[in-house]
Amino acid sequence: MKNITTRQFSVLADCGKIYQFMLDIYERDWKNGVPAPFFEYAFSSFAYWMDITYSYKNCIWEDHGEIVAFCFYEAPVTDIYFSLKPGYEELAPAMISYADEHMSIKGENIQLILFGGQDALMKAAMEKGYYQASETIDMQFDFEEMLNYPLPEGFHFVKPEEYDIDKVSKCCWKGFDHEQNEGPWEHQYEQSNYLLKVAPHATWEHAVIIADEKGEYACYAGMWWTPQNKLAYMEPLCTIPEYRNMGLASAALSELYRRMKKG
């Protein structure tokens, strides 16, 4: 007999438990919720874009002490996600009600992020008065196919043992257009990439970095290898403005494909 209890999420105590829960319920189509590296990448980015101030609002459902459901926000804090173990679909109405009543920050409207296959949650959301406002597509590449875009002349792949986290931070600063909007690189948020590098399940060594002839990092593709789910989760991906539309990102993805296929 099930014995369902709820409790609030604790950053210090629960990140590892939630990661394992997401590993255990993972399905390729995300019908049970986001993959584990999605969560860890976000919560390891608290020094930069992820606001964990309100993480106490995140809620965990347990059955005899085992995590079976999780409601949480990412970025922005108004985007609410749901992870639900198969066989516990009856919790969907309670999860939607919890989000509706407790996940709003200072009265802001929330939006529920649901994936195809999360039928029980979708039904509960509609019964609560929610409706589908938009749709996006998350792409996955099957390694049974081939990815083989060439590296443009004048660029090279940086060897993993030579990765420079300071250069990665500068590449991300420029690659996500912060230089245009906030000024030149002055080591802003450099701690963010360090925290990502040392995250519990980070696989920094599998990232792909492309540099120009002067050694400046031109393109960066992060990689969170999750062997338990046979998932190569790429996050982030950026190219600095002066080298865009040259095929660097395609070349980086091709190199990731070659490396991860071997793994």
Regions found by a protein language model. Give the residues of each.
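Flexible, substrate/cofactor-facing loop regions flanked by secondary structure
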Residues: 38-39, 147, 151-232
